[in-house]
Amino acid sequence: MPRILWSIVAVLALAGCGSAAPAPTPSATPSKVSSAAPPASASPAALAGPVRHILAFGDSLFAGYRLAPGQGYPERLQSALRARGINAEVTDAGVSGNTTADGRLRIRFVLNSLAARPDLALVELGGNDLLRGLSPQDARANLAAILDQLKARHIPVLLMGMKAPPNAGPEYQAQFDAIYPALAKQYHVRLVPFFLRPIYDRPALLQADHIHPTAQGVDALVAATVEDVARALPGAAVSRAGARSSDRL
């Protein structure tokens, strides 16, 4: 099982993993997820309140690597939130291969490119830092810089945590695993302790590369996190049945 976990977190950047950190360019401009009709369980009339804008800022796990249109995490999350009556529009700002340093470079560009200020930002980065064995201290500093940008604009955050595998070594593992809970506490943001927990030891939910989630794997990630997202939205109603045990600060 540790080997499977390492294969997931170590090669999230299958496309473009060897390139240098890209400068923000128009090609990195986030795209709004299609606002197609929500599923039958949530007709448009059932959607409550104004549009809730959510920014999904991350790497290939948000970018929908090798998935058909509409099957990525941002799209499926939007549908799941609408099924709960939340009038959500999720903007996909995932870029395959991004490290925390890449995210730090482009966060301001992404925020300046948005038509509306997000009601919530999902921050999901760090897997590619594991791939390259990059310094946990640098990863933490980069994530802190991203959170600083969001804090300055008064944008609430849900931080998607990652965990290093045991074969990364006990010292590296301890340092890396401490990043996300420490930042969540420092910045008073909500935390999903380990974003990949629903799929990391379930090969049937992974693509042939044994790295990226299949469409069913994405649905498992959404099912495990949709209530965390809903709770992180200021003023959003959340069903009691959906309560989970993940950290909420």
Language-model-derived ranges and their functions:
Residues M1-A15:
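Sec-dependent bacterial lipoprotein signal peptides
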Residues A13, E89-T91, L158:
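Conserved Rossmann-like nucleotide-binding pocket used by diverse enzymes
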Residues L61-G64, A68, G94-N98, N128-L130, ...:
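Short histidine/acidic/glycine/proline-rich micro-motifs that form metal-
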Residues P24-T25:
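Glycine/acidic-rich beta-strand-loop module
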